[in-house]
Structure formats: C-alpha cells, structure tokens
C-alpha cells in the first residue's frame, strides 16, 4: 500500500493530472508508516471528493473546482475514527457515512460544515459498502450497515432536520442467519433492503436476505449463487432489476426481479464476478 498518495486523472484521456501526498499523522498525533486511501466518493452537492484515510482515521475533502483542471488540493482534514473503510451518503447528500470497521463504528461527517457530526457504535466490523438509505414508516429517513463480524443489520436515524430526536441513533437491529456480510443495497423502486453474507462460515454464503422496508423486519433469505458465494447486489437504473454475483471461478451474474425477487436470467461462464456498477 505504497506510496501514500492519490492521483487525479483526466476523465476522457486518463492522462495523469496531479499526484498529491497524504498527511502522515493519525488522529492521535502518531506518525504513520503507511496511510491507505480506503474510499473516494464524489459529493452530490459541491465540486469535491470525499476521501477516507484508513490508518489516519481522517476524512479529507479534495477540491476539484480549479477552472484550469491542474490543482486538486486537500482543503479539509476532518478527524474521525480509525480505521476508516467504505462509505456513502444520506438521502440529502449533505452527510458522509463511513465505516470505521476496526473500531466497530459508523462515522457521520457533515459536508456543509466539514466537521464530525457523530459516531455510532455498531456491531462487530461494520461493512456497508456504499451503504443504503430509505424511508422507514416509523423512523423516517434511515441509513443502515451490515457487518462482517456479526449477523445483524444496524439501522440508524438519518434525518437530523426532520427527526432530530433519533438522528444518528440505532433504531432497529435486524438479526441475520450469519455474519460475513459485505454489502447492503436498495432502490426507491424496490420494497426490499438486500444483504449478502459472502464471508459466512455457517453455510449461508450462497444466500442473500431481504428486509422489508414496510415492516422493518427480515422477510426471507434465499439461495442465489450455485457454484460460489453470493456477493454484491446492484440495481439497474429504474430499479426494476437487481444483479447479484456468484463469486466463483465458474461464476455467474444472476438478475432478479426487484419486487418479486424471482430470477429473470443468469449470465454464466464468468470467472469470479464481483462488483457491478450502474
């Protein structure tokens, strides 16, 4: 994981534009030997990238508004928690929600004030991927994370303007049959929140689970993969389909109806398909 840098490329030509060194001191003031960029996401509202620095426990804000497209500096370093991994946004795009998975926390960063808004204690080793948000019938807008180290989904309030009483607090904990989850996904057109259990050690690695948005409870778990492990759900643009990988040297991508969860088609002969991005 060396060197500790990020590089900005031209989006059309892939020509390197600038290389920037990372800060090498963590949130406790300790000088680091390595500092990994764990995730990069683009703000929905401002010309910035939000960058998670794993070992440092810092969320950095990178400004890409230079009209000459030559300078892409870090303009804010926000102390958060170690060790940061993957994350995404709330429904407004104003808050960045990232897992500090070795600390068993979700971190909430306010991108408008560029400050730490909250930390949320979760289960063991939260791993939301880009995460998921939806409107719960009781709690309003929520986000959620699944976990590698524990078989549960932690759902937390994510509407500080509309529901400040439960903002950034756990409101539901939904038990899964196994630990080992890597991704949790949904779409406004689907009634489900879907969770994989890819790293399950109890025989559930071929299954995905469907949580009902209407009831806030686990509805069913069912096998999708045949040769390997089910991993990473991705919806198509209109939310009518969800694509799931069968992670195996003789793998496949399985397309499900996003409402009935019935299989529509299966693309086979794919060696270890993993992420799919729309």
Question: What do these predicted ranges mean?
Answer:
Residues 1-278:
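Predominantly soluble domains enriched in secretory-pathway, periplasmic, or organellar proteins
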């Amino acid at each position: 994981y060396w060197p500790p840098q990020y590089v900005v490329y031209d989006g059309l030509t892939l020509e390197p534009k600038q290389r920037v060194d990372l800060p090498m001191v963590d949130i406790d003031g300790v000088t680091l030997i390595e500092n990994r960029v764990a995730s990069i996401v683009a703000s929905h509202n401002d010309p910035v990238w939000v960058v998670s620095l794993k070992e440092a426990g810092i969320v950095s804000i990178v400004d890409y508004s230079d009209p000459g497209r030559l300078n892409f500096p870090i303009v804010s370093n926000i102390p958060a928690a170690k060790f940061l991994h993957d994350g995404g946004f709330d429904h407004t795009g104003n808050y960045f929600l990232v897992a500090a998975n070795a600390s068993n926390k979700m971190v909430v960063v306010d991108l408008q004030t560029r400050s730490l808004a909250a930390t949320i204690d979760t289960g063991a080793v939260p791993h939301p991927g880009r995460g998921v948000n939806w409107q719960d019938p009781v709690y309003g807008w929520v986000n959620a994370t699944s976990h590698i180290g524990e078989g549960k989904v932690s759902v937390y309030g994510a509407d500080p303007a509309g529901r400040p009483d439960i903002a950034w607090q756990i409101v539901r904990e939904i038990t899964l049959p196994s630990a080992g989850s890597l991704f949790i996904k949904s779409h406004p057109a689907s009634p489900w929140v879907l969770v994989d259990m890819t790293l399950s050690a109890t025989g559930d690695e071929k299954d995905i689970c469907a949580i009902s948005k209407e009831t806030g409870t686990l509805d069913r778990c069912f096998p999708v993969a045949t040769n390997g492990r089910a991993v990473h759900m991705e919806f198509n643009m209109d939310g009518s389909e969800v694509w799931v990988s069968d992670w195996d040297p003789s793998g496949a991508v399985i397309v499900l109806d996003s409402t009935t969860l019935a299989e529509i088609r299966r693309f086979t002969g794919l060696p270890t398909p993993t992420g799919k991005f729309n």
